[in-house]
Amino acid sequence: VPAQPELSNDDVTLLVRTEDPFMKKIEQIDSRWFIRFSAYSADKGHAYWRHMDPLLCRHGVALALNMAFMFASEEFNVEMNAYEGKLKDNGGKPINLDALRQRIRSHGGLVLGRVVGVGGLGGGNTYGLADYCYKGVYFDATAPGSHPHSYPRQAMFHEYGHCLGYSHSSTMTYGNQWTVLCATVFVVMGQEGKLPVCSKEQVENLPM
């Protein structure tokens, strides 16, 4: 293609067309989160923050992809409808589910970090999890038939509840509402092969 110096960036659109099953799933994500990484205060002797490593970064990207994909799925949104009136904001008032969906879609993104001593830290774009939480959220990280609301999955969605602006006064962090809803759908979709990255082994078997 010959050079087109008269074209500006606004005149150009990049489209990627593929029949790859993974990319077909990615196309269904309706949020536009950025994904970044940070050591936060790891170099300043912070009690909780530590450096990410390459494997945790991979697990972090898989976690964010899976979470965004699940939130956009029909399976999740049908199940969430059953929680009408049960998801409460910081003041104890029922959350409008359509407003919550829009809040998820318009959330800026996640700056992923690693923590020790706690399961996670989150709020705004800050999203930190312990190693065992990054690696323990996949459906095959727990025994078949076990309750999907394991601690790593609870931490995963608890911290995202904080990222959406909800405190411990809401049902979006603790309790048997938001985190149970999310963990249950997440495990089922993983078992059925519907998530972009279903198994821990898909990440850990990649060459480093």
Please tell me what each predicted stretch does.
Residues M156:
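Substrate/cofactor-recognition hotspot
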Residues E159:
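Walker B catalytic acidic pair
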Residues V1-R153, C163-M208:
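Predominantly extracellular/secreted Zn2+-dependent metalloproteases
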